[in-house]
């Protein structure tokens, strides 16, 4: 069975904890990350551990493996750091990464952070949008390329020419080191060409439908499609109030509200994203988002 966890708003609705719960009630699940990539931040807590997932699926604390589809970006530096952080917590995560996943480089991260357009429209600052744009411009670097030294070096040179600026040598060698370590971790970080077979598939979405380029308010949208068709069941997620990180339209901001800040809130004001905003929930906007998906029932 295929189940999808989709945010109804502007992101930060609770997709991680929902994915974690669904993994607890089905047999032999696989979490599938199908959109976005390493820019996600999905927090899951259990009795012993709290973790924010960016490079692994949110079923990882339960020992559920992750499949990273070819539509998702991979940040080798972030992936290795999160793998080590999970190991330090006694967790040995397994992730299947599609060979065609786009790779985020230090060049993409710098481009994301210095772009005036990104600052205006909104960015997490981890290179996601720049990676997608570079791929569309045919300067491609994929997960499979990391396993071929000459291909990797050649494509990195081409990417530097594409951006027309250098990066700090520390960032470059940190990236190269992460790539080499990931190759050595093949037992846990696995290169695949198709999704492995499991009994149940939990499709963990990223961000929210109101950031989908076909649904949200351009230009304050993301570079990936939030919705996925063909699921057996959909779980549309919202908080009891509306949230948005950074710039862009948001309902009910002119209405006074008294929303207590959760002391365990993961989302805070961010150097690149900006302020984490809260307003009263607009149920009609939730209805609009669902209508745009054409999901019935």
Locations of the language-model features?
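Non-transmembrane, aqueous-exposed alpha-helical and coiled segments at domain scale
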Residues: 1-297
